[in-house]
């Protein structure tokens, strides 16, 4: 079986800087009924891809936060006396989720203006409070950049059935007063968590001890190892509800011994982009034999070995540039769309995305995705079916239905990469 791993620097040290995708992911867009979305996991289809999270701060009210990169918005001004500004329409709808039926219970639309009076900000955060009693809901949030004409819609699961589930916690980095909308944290950051519905409790922190392995190949008889609460070890806790995040997967909860809580994992700086040379060799494991990968990873000069791999695969440095750009662009897309309790490229969907690229079509239901490569009705088309798995660590976990028949397709695509050819649907 061939696997490969390689993480690219934004200004690629060997050849050419790849196009960075300054995006991140909180939950994947979902549909509540069978649908065939035009939306694929190709970042070039998105002008902006915000991250969104919901927080329950009291028994009868909640709040959502939206992060958007300023560089993804269009800032303009009517005349030279005005500040540059971006203008957004943000609307949301809340539906009850009972007995497999939906009922609209709340909807609002607001105008949001961000002014650049004090220079360019890296991110813009919008937040709004709304009334919400205990229960299970879905929430549709739509964002439109009025100056550019681009728009984005996302549906989230909103779970307020108890006080210790994931959306009862807000996560902050270092001394920031702005909450995080993603669960990927830079290694070495000080993490602080608040939970107003559990204000009288000291949070318990846990760390997952086993190594999170790469997913088995799509033709394997094995399934991915999903973290189990029994493999977490309890850390020392105090009233500060904070810790310094070392490498790994963490979990915080107000309910001792419960797997209801807030999970987060550490990443290198710049995530979901790939920037540092010590990251670059990991994703190429999908394309190499174990011996080849060990030769790269354990070498005193892994970059030179990695460069050699790409040049030998491509045949020339110019073709190697194309391979590198395509491969690491896909790594960044996987990190953007498929992050769960680990980096997106390490998930089932990330693995398929790196090797096969964006599918021709995606059929979605509330709890599944089917990726179709080729014409849907053709006998020659390839279908990958992913089932959503309920997990205390993430709301974005999809597991591939593996099949021995995928082996020839996988080996053909890996062989194409190793012979300097990239297929894009």
Regions found by a protein language model. Give the residues of each.
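C-terminal motif of bacterial Sec signal peptides marking the signal peptidase cleavage site
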Residues: 22-25
């Amino acid at each position: 079986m061939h696997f490969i791993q390689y993480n690219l620097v934004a200004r690629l040290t060997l050849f050419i800087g790849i196009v960075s995708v300054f995006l991140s992911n909180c939950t994947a867009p979902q549909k509540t009924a069978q649908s065939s979305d035009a939306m694929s996991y190709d970042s070039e289809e998105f002008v902006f891809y915000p991250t969104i999270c919901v927080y329950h701060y009291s028994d009868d009210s909640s709040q959502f936060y939206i992060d958007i990169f300023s560089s993804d918005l269009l800032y303009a001004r009517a005349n030279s006396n005005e500040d540059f500004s971006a203008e957004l329409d943000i609307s949301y709808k809340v539906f009850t989720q009972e007995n497999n039926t939906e009922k609209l219970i709340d909807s609002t639309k607001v105008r949001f203006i961000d002014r650049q009076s004090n220079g360019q900000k890296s991110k813009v955060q919008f937040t709004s409070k709304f009334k919400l009693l205990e229960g299970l809901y879905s929430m549709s949030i739509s964002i439109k950049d009025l100056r550019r004409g681009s728009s984005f819609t996302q549906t989230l699961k909103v779970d307020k059935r108890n006080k210790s589930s994931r959306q009862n916690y807000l996560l902050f980095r270092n001394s920031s007063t702005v909450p995080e909308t993603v669960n990927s944290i830079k290694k070495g950051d000080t993490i602080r968590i608040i939970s107003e519905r559990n204000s009288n409790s000291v949070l318990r922190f846990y760390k997952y001890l086993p190594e999170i392995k790469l997913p088995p190949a799509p033709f394997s008889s094995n399934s991915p190892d999903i973290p189990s609460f029994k493999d977490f070890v309890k850390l020392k806790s105090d009233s500060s509800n904070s810790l310094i995040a070392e490498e790994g997967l963490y979990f915080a909860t107000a309910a001792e011994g419960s797997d209801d809580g807030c999970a987060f994992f550490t990443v290198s700086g710049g995530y979901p982009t790939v920037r540092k040379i010590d990251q670059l060799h990991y994703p190429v494991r999908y394309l190499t034999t174990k011996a080849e990968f060990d030769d790269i990873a354990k070498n005193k000069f892994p970059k030179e070995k990695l460069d050699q791999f790409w040049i030998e695969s491509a045949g020339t440095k110019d073709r190697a540039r194309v391979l590198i750009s395509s491969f690491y662009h896909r790594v960044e897309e996987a990190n953007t769309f498929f992050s769960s309790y680990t980096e997106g490229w390490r998930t089932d969907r990330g693995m398929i995305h790196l090797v096969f690229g964006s599918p021709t079509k995606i059929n979605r239901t509330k709890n599944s995705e089917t990726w179709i490569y080729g014409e849907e009705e053709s006998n020659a088309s390839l279908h990958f079916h992913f089932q959503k798995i309920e997990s205390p660590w993430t709301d974005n976990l999809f597991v591939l239905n593996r099949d021995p028949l995928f082996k020839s397709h996988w080996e053909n695509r890996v062989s194409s990469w190793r012979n300097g050819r990239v297929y894009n649907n």
